Structures are given as C-alpha cells and as structure tokens.
Amino acid sequence: MGQPINYDLAKDALQKLNTDDTISSAHGLLCGFYCVKQDIQLDDWLNEILVSIDLNNLLEKESHHVLAEIFNNTSEQLADPTLNFSPVIADDASPLREQANTLIEWCQGFLVGLGLSSVETSDE
C-alpha cells in the first residue's frame, strides 16, 4: 500500500527541475494518465511535465529520484482496493487559499492527463 506523499518535499523536488508545472498539476496529470492506461511508464509522465533533465546534475538526479518515488507510490495507491489515495495538494496546515489553488491545479492536471491519454467518450 502506498504511503501519503509529502506535498512540500514533492514541490521542492519539482521546482529544482526544468518545468512550468506545479507538483499538484503534475500529480493530477499522472492520475489522469493512470485512470486510462494502468501500464503507464515513469518516462511517459516525465516527458509530459519536464522540458529536460540532466541526470549528471546531482540536484536534478535527486529530484528525479523523488519523482520516481511519487510515480511508484501513486501507482500503488491507485491500484489499492481499499482506495487509500490522496492527491498531492497543500495540507491542512497551509493557508486555505493555497489548499484551494493546489486542488484546482490538481483537477486541471487530471483533466489534461485524461485528454492526453485519449480517453474515449460518447454522446449517449
């Protein structure tokens, strides 16, 4: 069973990389991908959220490791039959505005993930 993901640790890791995404939107995107295609690979997700990554750079390599842990943990959470899942958004100790903004970012990322995964819809 996947453990809850530390929002601040995840946020710091992503900020060290070449991206315009927030950790909340990036996590939402991952969840949207996963809901359509459970065999998603780490590189599929990283290719959508990162412009580039230099694994020879120690800070970027550490951040890559954190993102890989988030990926694996999220996959475990979403596959858990007890539905032990939490979106990566600001926690209860954060100001309400930040909590709301990160929830909005997560939802937007989720919808983008569904769209990029070509989720099938019908008019019926």
Where in the sequence are the language-model features?
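Domain-length accessory/inserted modules outside core catalytic folds
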Residues: M1-C107, L111-E124
